[in-house]
From Swiss-Prot:
EC number: 3.5.4.34
Protein name per Swiss-Prot or TrEMBL: tRNA-specific adenosine deaminase 1
Organism of derivation: Homo sapiens
Residue ranges of every copy of the A to I editase domain listed in the record: 63-501
Enzyme active site: 89
Binding residues annotated for Zn(2+), in chain numbering: 87, 142, 299
GO BP terms: tRNA processing
Function per UniProt: Specifically deaminates adenosine-37 to inosine in tRNA-Ala.
Gene for this chain: ADAT1
Length: 502
């Protein structure tokens, strides 16, 4: 039906053609990360491939995001008008929610071209059965999925581990982030790298299912800029300090790619030991900030949550019969481990039970493309040669949604690019995908639906604040509570007063 390379190429072309220069990295000096949601439509009468005749599908990018930054907790605001987390995956998901809101509006106003059809209960909708959604990311998600075995012939991509820093890697119960002074020096696999990675012979196994772990190595890049080779493997992470398995070419696992995301209070914590035993896998982690701690969970953790609760969030669950799940995740060319992805996104939650009707741990298909994002850290590093100055992450984030009004949204530091201190708090200083604006769009949608056609969850009581609307989505809240009790008990949640806006 489709391949990982086809998804990656579609997203790269969309980024190059549909997104303007504004918000993109400065050539040879900045890099960024890319994520997107792709809608795949199969012919209604042919949902499956057959050996003699593959099904022809229609692929469309419906949301896209770029970004590498988070704001610190001291910059968070209680009126919902700032983006706390601007990592590409989160921007793409919030942009996807804008798209879903628009599609629900089309359905509610009886338009024929909506992705939704009426559900079995009054006032709710469900996704058409000929549609699925695939999530693309140019890089492995930060956090648990980025703890990847490293072979001895690979250049060291992370900063040295100093014992005084390692011993300070834990966090107090009252805080939620990194050791002092580390400031994102050791990031996910697309983080700053001081040496070019060597090209290893071989061809990437580009399509692997969640049930198997295959050794992968990258050969010549198929399209885009010439890049340094990036090697990946799928050796077990647990017990790497004493691992004796030998990879092809007699290369031992000597270290792991580091994630800058730090363990949350209540988790066991990393050992901080030099080499392969540095990280403990499977833990909840918080994204790093520069100086000021953040309250943003890692992308690995958020994507694992989406795989149980859906991508629609609590608000939209009022209007949906079932959660909106991703069918597959495709990762671009980068350091990668199938085992780490499987563990981080699926394995940690696979034994969750007693979820409400419609919710469940999804059999997410996880694949990797052989195509490199041309504005990724490693691609820019390879092209810039002796360019003066440091290579730094782009400070802007781009949101794009397949909606007719203001599809593009460019932000920096959580606000629309160009926002000044004087304009903060005004309507023009709000991102289209901020909590308050998504809530406003949700309320606007409700205003276009006759009250007697609202779902029961919205008619049973008077709701006023963002928090009240979220809490009233009872099935979603029950599923989220179950997930926290059974697996994610240390998940950092913002206090209710951050959700009291109207």
């Amino acid at each position: 039906m489709w391949t990982a390379d086809e998804i990656a190429q579609l997203c790269y072309e969309h980024y190059g053609i549909r997104l303007p220069k504004k918000g993109k990295p400065e050539p040879n000096h900045e890099w960024t990360l890319l994520a997107a949601v792709v809608k795949i439509q199969s012919p209604a009468d042919k949902a499956c491939d057959t050996p003699d005749k593959p099904v022809q599908v229609t692929k469309e990018v419906v949301s896209m995001g770029t970004g590498t930054k988070c704001i610190g907790q001291s910059k968070m605001r209680k009126n919902g008008d700032i983006l706390n987390d601007s990592h590409a995956e989160v921007i793409a998901r919030r942009s996807f929610q804008r798209y879903l809101l628009h599609q629900l509006q089309l359905a509610a106003t009886l338009k024929e071209d909506s992705i939704f059809v009426p559900g079995t209960q009054k006032g709710v909708w469900k996704l058409r059965r000929d549609l699925i959604f695939v999530f693309f990311s140019s890089h492995t998600p930060c956090g648990d999925a980025s703890i990847i075995p490293m072979l001895e012939f690979e250049d060291q991509p992370c900063c040295p581990v100093f014992r005084n820093w390692a011993h300070n890697s834990s966090v107090e119960a009252s805080s939620n982030l990194e050791a002092p002074g580390n400031e994102r020096k050791c990031e996910d696999p697309d983080s700053p790298v001081t040496k070019k990675m060597r090209l290893e012979p071989g061809t990437a196994a580009r399509e692997v299912t969640n049930g198997a772990a295959h050794h992968q190595s990258f050969g010549k890049q198929k399209s885009g800029p010439i890049s340094p080779g990036i090697h990946s493997c799928d050796l077990t992470v647990e017990g790497l300090a004493t691992v004796t398995r030998i990879a092809p070419g007699s290369a031992k696992v000597i270290d792991v790619y580091r994630t800058g995301a730090k363990c949350v209070p209540g988790e066991a914590g990393d050992s901080g030991k030099p080499g392969a035993a540095f990280h403990q896998v499977g833990l909840l982690r918080v994204k790093p900030g520069r100086g000021d701690r953040t309250r943003s969970m890692s992308c690995s953790d958020k994507m694992a949550r989406w795989n149980v609760l859906g991508c629609q969030g609590a608000l939209l669950m009022h209007l949906l019969e079932e959660p909106i799940y991703l069918s597959a995740v495709v990762i671009g060319k980068c350091p990668y481990s199938q085992e780490a992805m499987q563990r981080a996104l699926i394995g940690r939650c696979q034994n969750v039970s007693a979820l409400p009707k419609g919710f469940g741990v999804q059999e997410l298909k996880i694949l990797q493309s052989d195509l490199l994002f041309e504005q990724s850290r490693s691609a820019v590093q390879a092209k810039r040669a002796d360019s003066p100055g440091r290579l730094v992450p782009c400070g802007a984030a781009i949101s794009w949604s397949a909606v007719p009004e203001q599809p593009l949204d460019v932000t920096a530091n959580g606000f629309p690019q160009g926002t000044t201190k004087k304009t903060i708090g005004s309507l023009q200083a709000r991102s289209q995908i901020s909590k308050v604006e998504l809530f406003r769009s949700f309320q606007k949608l409700l205003s276009r639906i006759a009250r007697d056609k609202w779902p029961h969850s919205l008619r049973v009581q008077k709701l006023d604040t963002y928090q009240e609307y979220k809490e009233a989505a009872s099935s979603y809240q029950e599923a989220w509570s179950t997930l926290r009790k059974q697996v994610f008990g240390s998940w950092i949640r913002n206090p209710p007063d951050y959700h009291q806006f109207k």
